[in-house]
């Protein structure tokens, strides 16, 4: 597979207010490091110099984040109003994301909900990594929830592998990678949370891809499906042999799922009160005044947890 380049940028959605790109793997979104010759910011500036905004730090308003090693859908707001509209969707938990991944081993269950709380790893030598609650050095674990559906079983370079669809219901740093590792099925090619191998035929990339994205803003619904990169025609090392669930059917189900009501100020997915039965739920909170800058802080912190891997 060809590495990324400044000239090679795939656009999967464009409107007056938004762009959605299909980010190449092993490409940072932005960086202040002079040695970074390839970033998504530089790709955008090369393709769309007229869209760069000098009032922003990097020239473009990225609505969310993807890890350096992760490929797939990433939304860019083209003006301040559009960025605010996307921000409200994230704040109100109305954004839907789904990822494709190749995981080590054959997962026997057809569907799994992973609910390990995730916190920072303070263990020496594990800086900038995350871990599940109960692990040595786990600090400030927060509730985390991921739905997993097994699509196919097969072999990758002769080793058993499962192709899965992952839907994060919370947004912790490295959530999908940590949850899959905790399940005993790390992402193929994940050198941080998977098995470190000295084999020369190790995968050329981490097999995690942001496949589906839906942001129902006030003015338009930004919805995209990016091409599936985990096909035998694209990677000869991947050889599926058993189909368990149709990806097309899952996409149809994702598209048919109604968006949450923005007026519903109920608990966030995975929060304790969200799991209470109907009669036991607390009454709805009173109408709140407009959000202040101080009140925006917690949500901005939440958004920052869809974080990039640190420069190294």
Curated annotation (Swiss-Prot):
State the InterPro entries in the record.
PsdUridine_synth_cat_dom_sf, PsdUridine_synth_RsuA/RluA, RluA_PseudoU_synthase
Q: Name one GO biological process term.
A: enzyme-directed rRNA pseudouridine synthesis
Keyword Acetylation carried by entry:
yes
Q: Which Gene3D superfamilies does UniProt cross-reference here?
A: Pseudouridine synthase (3.30.2350.10)
Keywords, sorted A to Z:
Acetylation
Post-translational modification N-acetylmethionine, affected residues: 1
* Superkingdom of the organism of origin: Eukaryota
Q: Where is this region: Disordered?
A: 256-298
Q: Where is the active site?
A: 67
Q: Name one Pfam family in it.
A: PseudoU_synth_2
Biased composition (Pro residues) is annotated at 279-289
GO MF terms here are: pseudouridine synthase activity; RNA binding
Family, as annotated: Belongs to the pseudouridine synthase RluA family.
Q: Return the protein name.
A: RNA pseudouridylate synthase domain-containing protein 1
Source species of the chain: Homo sapiens (Human)
Chain's gene name: RPUSD1
